[in-house]
Amino acid sequence: MTAVQQPAATASRPAVRQRIDWIDTAKGLCMILVIVGHTLPYGNLMRNFIFSFHMPAFFFLTGYTARRPDTWQGFARRVRKDFVALIVPVLGVVQVFNVLLNFFLSDDRSLTNLWDIARYNAITLFWASGNPADGIPSCGMPWFLFALFWGKLIWELLGLLFPKGDFAVSFIVMLFGAYIGQVQYLPQCLDVAMVVVMYLTLGQLFRQHQALLDRYRVPLFLAMLIPWAWCCQQGIYIELASRHTSITFCALPSVYAASGSSAIYAVN
C-alpha cells in the first residue's frame, strides 16, 4: 500500500504514515493492466488504451507521494536509499540467481560457460533495456526499476539545481530523452529515465494543487477524457520499454499519465 510521511511529529508520538486509498487503488489497477496489456496483440484498441497510461501512471503516482530533498546531504542519502531498495535486489536476482540457474540448467558445466553466462547477464544489466535493439539485449522486467532509480535521481537533482523552473526544465529533459531514445538507446535506460522525469513532476504538481483539483474533480476528468479517448482511438500511445514515443505527440503521453491516474482519483 502507498503511504506518505507526515511532516509533523511530537516527542510523545512519532510521525505516522497515512494511507492514500485512491493511489493504492490506482497502483493495484495498473499492476493488473500490466499483465493484461502484455497478452494483447499490437494494434489492439484495448492494448492501446492500456499502454496509453499504465506505465507512466506508476511514475506519476511516485511523483505524487515523493518528497524531494532540499539539501545535498539529503540528496546523497536518498540516492543511497533508492539504490539499496531498487538496484541491489535486481543485481542479486538477475546477476546471481539467473546466472547460477542458467548455468546449472545447461549441459555445459565448464567455467568458460559460467563466465559467458555471467558476462551476458552483466551486459543486459549495463543497458537495462526493456526491449532488444541493434545488438542491445533485453533485461526484461528490471528495466522499470532502473528507469525509476535514474529518473528519481535526475528529478531530485533538477529540484536542487532549478527550484523555480521545475516544470519547464522537466519538459525539456523529457523531450531530449524521447529524442535520444529514437536515435540510440542509452546505458542504464537513461533515455527513458529522462522521460520519466516529466511524469514525476506532473505527480508532484498534482499533489501541490490538490485543493483546487478537489473542487473541479469531475470537470477535470471529463476534460482529460476527451483527448485521451481520441488518442487511444487513433493508436497514439506510449510504450516506454520499446521507446515508442513520438516527438510530435510527446506532450500527450504526459497527459495520459495524469488522465489515467486522475480518472481513478475522480471516481474514488
Language-model regions, residue ranges each:
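Alpha-helical transmembrane segments and their immediate juxtamembrane cytosolic regions
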Residues: 2-268
